[in-house]
Amino acid sequence: MSRHLISTLAIPLFSLLTLSFAAQAQAQQPIRPPIATTQVEGTDNVYIFRNGGHQAMFVVTSDGVIATDPVAYGKPTGGQDYLNEIRKLTDKPIRYLVYSHHHFDHIAGGKVFKDAGAKVLAHRIAKARLERLNDPHTVLPDEAWAMRVV
């Protein structure tokens, strides 16, 4: 084969292969992480919420719900899945939402809980870090505590 023929065929073949791979990649939708809630063995009111590889816990008390870490895979409205799972078990008010720390994967769903009436709590260091980050999508804690672990 001549060089001219090879180069003439190579460009369209390369383009066809590239378009084929691009179309295939675009056709594959991201897999939604599995959502599950399980009761902690030996308890009547403590639950673990799982959102893919993340988990949080909540406690249903006689006065309402205390939830932790609104894991939401980085979407400000992603906490709705967590709230929906709580609502499958109780219609009691969400009293408190506790951030374990300031990482976005653990706090991204805070707005949904705040809108549901929760008071948001965190350690004072987490609150200070969230204030410094100044992310408009982040719900800042209403209250912070200073606890020392010895």
Residue positions per predicted region:
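Boundary at the C-terminal end of the N-terminal hydrophobic targeting segment
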Residues: 22-27
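Active-site HxH/HxHxD metal-binding segment of metal-dependent hydrolases
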Residues: 37, 84-149
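Positively charged n-region of N-terminal signal peptides that target proteins for export
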Residues: 1-5
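Conserved beta-strand hairpin/beta-sheet module of binuclear metal-dependent hydrolase folds
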Residues: 36-86
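Bacterial N-terminal signal peptides
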Residues: 8-20
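Short, solvent-exposed loop/turn segments at the edges of secondary structure
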Residues: 15, 52-54, 115, 140
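Short glycine- and acidic-rich boundary segments immediately preceding or forming the N-terminal edge
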Residues: 29-32
